[in-house]
Curated annotation (Swiss-Prot):
Highest taxon of the lineage: Bacteria
A Gene Ontology term for the protein's cellular component: cytoplasm
Protein name per its UniProtKB record: Uncharacterized HTH-type transcriptional regulator SAB2242
Pfam families: LytTR (PF04397)
An example molecular function term from Gene Ontology annotations: DNA binding
Annotated localization: Cytoplasm
PROSITE patterns: HTH_LYTTR
HTH LytTR-type domain residues: 44-147
Organism this protein belongs to: Staphylococcus aureus (strain bovine RF122 / ET3-1)
InterPro entries per UniProt: LytR-like, LytTR_DNA-bd_dom
Keyword Transcription carried by entry: yes
Main location: cytoplasm
Keywords, sorted A to Z: Cytoplasm, DNA-binding, Transcription, Transcription regulation
Length: 147
């Protein structure tokens, strides 16, 4: 059980968070990630033909580069974005994982993993398709998924 103390002081010039813990663990890291994600945007602007759509990041299953365009894929739609993948990666919450040079997946949309004999990871996603990680990102993926 974690204890929480909140101190409201009108004399403070800015809000800040102190974390006291006997050691670094998954709970502490989750708190740090949640606090860091507070400043990140929760929506993106996507395009379908000439229509402009507001996309909630939590609805996105994966971001893929398709024909040199970054595409946000949700359960029902594919939206073109005007961002580069590396720009998008900086804006996304911690639960989005870069799995290759051309794809970022939502960790919460991964249904199962299959370790292939060649060392790659096949990821089955909620929209009933699968994708592969690249070897270059394998170590990072395993760390982020705790496998």
């Amino acid at each position: 059980m974690m204890k929480l103390n909140l101190f409201i002081n009108a004399n403070e010039t800015e809000s800040y968070i102190d974390i006291h813990a006997p050691k670094m663990n998954d709970h502490v890291q989750s708190i740090i990630n949640a606090v860091n994600d507070l400043d990140k945007s929760h929506t993106l602007v996507g395009y379908i033909d000439k229509e402009i759509h507001i996309i909630h990041i939590s609805d996105v299953i994966t971001f893929q580069v398709i024909n040199k365009n970054v595409t946000a894929i949700t359960r029902n739609q594919k939206f073109k974005l005007k961002l580069r993948l590396y720009e998008l990666e900086k804006q996304l919450p911690q639960h989005f994982i870069r799995i290759s040079k051309s794809e970022i997946v939502n960790k919460y949309c991964i249904e199962k993993l299959l370790l292939e004999p060649n060392g790659l990871i096949r990821m089955y996603l909620k929209d009933a398709h699968y994708t592969y990680s690249s070897r270059r990102y394998l170590k990072s993926i395993k760390e982020r998924l705790s496998i």
